[in-house]
Curated annotation (Swiss-Prot):
Coiled-coil annotated residue ranges, if any: none
Any GO CC annotation of this UniProt entry: cytoplasm
Protein's name according to its UniProt entry: Homoserine kinase
Similarity field: Belongs to the GHMP kinase family. Homoserine kinase subfamily.
Annotated pathway: Amino-acid biosynthesis; L-threonine biosynthesis; L-threonine from L-aspartate: step 4/5
Residues at which ATP binds: 91-101
Length: 309
């Protein structure tokens, strides 16, 4: 049996709408992501396990893991009889790349099981295609970091889908999922069709400055440039308590904060462990809305998707 783990990811990172994403892993060693298992069988089957399995579609053909298997078989031009298991540990509609976790884990597991017939670029292209079935448009800002690890910048030119941007070891990512669901499609529909020139200029300045600060090793400058004029001003209304939480974490000492993906998860960047702990405690007490909510203190996951022994 092949078992593959795919980590959670935080897309957009305020400054890079649809073009930046980071894979994350809890500092306590726990796994925040999905696991897909593949083993030989006489015919295809799919079993759903894990904390959030009950939230998955009841019809197997609507399950994205089934669609990954179907698409992988199509790519190879043959049916591959396997028994697949999805351990759904990620909440759906959380802003933590839940669908990307399932897509990446499923496709990497199938590729490993079949002896790696597809290279990383082809795999990533198929991942983006399948992610697009859920969110409504092909985009790679969750699947690329989830698959490849680290902080990824979407290029989509010259045969290159994404490339890694150097992160900062001292950054701690406090991720607070309040326990409610925000549909990616709904969060995209709320955005304007056109933007003011001054917002386009500000967005370009922030993103270019952020990438420059990452390469020139200026962590505080990079954090200060993590501002969003494209999505967050419009999406805040979908997230109860977000603006108050953002103000509170800044007062505690977070160097940046924003919406993870399309929400409702909030991310807060801290450069000191004690600050991260205080931010996590405040968010656990004030931002979570039900028993399904959680807070994790994370670092960048530089490994990406990996086979579990």
């Amino acid at each position: 049996m092949v078992r593959v783990y795919a980590p959670a990811s935080s897309a957009n990172m305020s400054v890079g709408f649809d073009v930046l994403g980071a894979a994350v892993t809890p500092i306590d060693g726990s796994l925040l992501g999905d696991v897909v298992g593949v083993e030989a069988a006489d015919s295809f089957s799919l079993q759903n396990l894990g904390r959030f399995a009950s939230k998955l579609p009841s019809k197997p053909r609507e399950n994205i893991v089934y669609q990954c298997w179907e698409r992988f078989c199509q790519e190879l031009g043959k049916q591959i009889p396997v028994a697949m298991t999805l351990e759904k540990n990620m909440p759906i509609g959380s802003g933590l790349g839940s669908s990307a976790c399932s897509v990446v884990a499923a496709l990497v597991a199938m590729n490993e099981y079949c002896g790696k017939p597809l290279n990383d670029t082809r795999l990533l292209a198929i991942m983006g295609e399948l992610e697009g079935r859920i969110s409504g448009s092909i985009h790679y800002d969750n699947v690329a970091p989830c698959f490849l690890g680290g902080m990824q910048l979407m290029i989509e030119e010259n045969g290159i889908i994404s490339q890694q941007v150097p992160g900062f070891d001292e950054w701690l990512w406090v991720l607070a999922y309040p326990g409610i669901k925000v549909s990616t499609a709904e969060a995209r529909a709320i955005l304007p069709a056109q933007y003011r020139r001054q917002d386009c200029i500000a967005h370009g300045r922030h993103l270019a400055g952020f990438i420059h600060a990452c390469y020139s090793r200026q962590p505080l400058l990079a954090a200060k440039l993590m501002k969003d004029v494209i999505a967050e001003p419009y999406r805040e209304r979908l997230l109860p308590g977000f603006s108050q939480a953002r103000q509170a974490v800044a007062e505690i000492g977070a160097v940046a904060s924003g919406i993870s993906g399309s929400g409702p998860t909030l991310f807060a960047l801290c450069d000191k462990p004690d600050t991260a702990q205080r931010v996590a405690e405040w968010l656990a007490k004030n931002y979570l809305q039900n028993q399904e909510g959680f807070v994790h203190i994370c670092r960048l996951d530089t490994a990406g998707a990996r086979v579990l022994e």
